[in-house]
Regions:
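Boundary at the C-terminal end of the N-terminal hydrophobic targeting segment
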Residues: 24-29
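Short, solvent-exposed loop/turn elements at domain surfaces
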Residues: 56-61, 90, 228-231, 253-256
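Bacterial N-terminal signal peptides that target proteins for export
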Residues: 2-14
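A glycine-rich, often tryptophan-bearing local segment used as a flexible ligand/cofactor-contacting loop or short
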Residues: 51, 112-193
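Bacterial N-terminal signal peptides
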Residues: 13-23
């Protein structure tokens, strides 16, 4: 009997060892599989397309955006394309607009332009698919042309209300700049939660947009210029598209850590 008990104990020990080995091997396989999935995700970098204009009144977007895009590429691994168009405002066009159709995120920092019908339709179709958009500063009159519109071109003034959820109601004085504050009730929002300090100063003049047309928009930042206070950054939904807009974007803003963090967080939020 003693020999049988010892033999049974020996067999149980071997069995438990085998089960442990199988479990550990399975866990290792799962870990390897997870790493492979992560590597695949890393290989599929999100495609971001910026639409910008070189315009004396467009706050040097043709200089600031390419530099910021390089940060997004080198430090954050995004696949970034910056499209700078050409032509008069009433007959403006971009090269390689097919990039917008393939983009995961479209960022607009353009001012008062009309585009060829086909190019405007690319933007509209992009949004109709529920893809996200970020608007910077002059985006709140990006496609509201004032110049004579050329034959075969079109503007899209409804973009401001329908997509950004606001109206362009004018501008505040240039001199005092803007005292920027995170809205306290939304301070935990991922777009602003890690911005420190939560108050800073922008050299740009304030855009007048209050009250927002979209009453459900989530205001993240307000700006004060003299006695004028306005929402200056918010999120909303345009159909199924996530939208972030900020009226910041003055050239000096792109040198400020707070603003760059704001844009980076907004990019992450829209792509999530």
């Amino acid at each position: 009997m003693g020999i049988l008990k010892r033999h049974k104990s020996y067999l149980l020990t071997i069995l438990f060892a085998f089960i442990s080995f199988v479990n550990s091997t399975s866990l290792m396989a799962n870990d390897i599989h997870q790493l492979q999935n992560n590597n695949i995700k890393e290989m599929k970098k999100a495609k971001i397309v910026f639409l910008i204009t070189e315009d004396p009144d467009n706050y040097e977007a043709h200089k600031t955006v390419p530099r910021f895009a390089e940060i997004l590429r080198k430090e954050h691994g995004y696949d970034v394309t910056v499209l700078l168009g050409s032509g008069d405002r009433g007959s403006y066009s971009y090269p390689n607009m097919k990039a917008v159709s393939k983009a995961d995120l479209l960022v607009v920092f353009a001012r008062r332009i009309a585009l060829p019908h086909k190019q405007m339709n690319i933007i509209k179709n992009y949004l109709a698919k529920g893809k996200p958009l970020i608007g910077i500063r002059t985006a709140n009159h990006a496609f509201t042309a004032r110049d004579k519109i050329g034959e075969g071109f079109e503007d899209w003034p409804e973009f401001v209300a329908d997509i950004l959820g606001c109206e362009n109601r004018g501008y505040g004085p240039v001199g005092p700049g803007i005292d920027v504050s995170v809205v306290s009730e939304n301070a935990n929002d991922p777009i602003v939660s890690n911005i420190s300090p939560s108050r800073w100063h922008s050299e740009g003049n304030i855009y007048l947009v209050a009250p927002l047309l979209d009453k459900k928009a989530k205001v993240l930042l307000t700006g004060k210029s003299n006695d004028i206070t306005q929402p200056i950054a918010w999120t909303r939904r345009a159909g199924k598209s996530k939208v972030f807009y900020t009226s910041l974007g003055y050239p000096a803003d792109f040198e400020m850590p707070e603003f760059k963090t704001l844009l980076l967080n907004a990019i992450k939020w829209t792509l999530k």
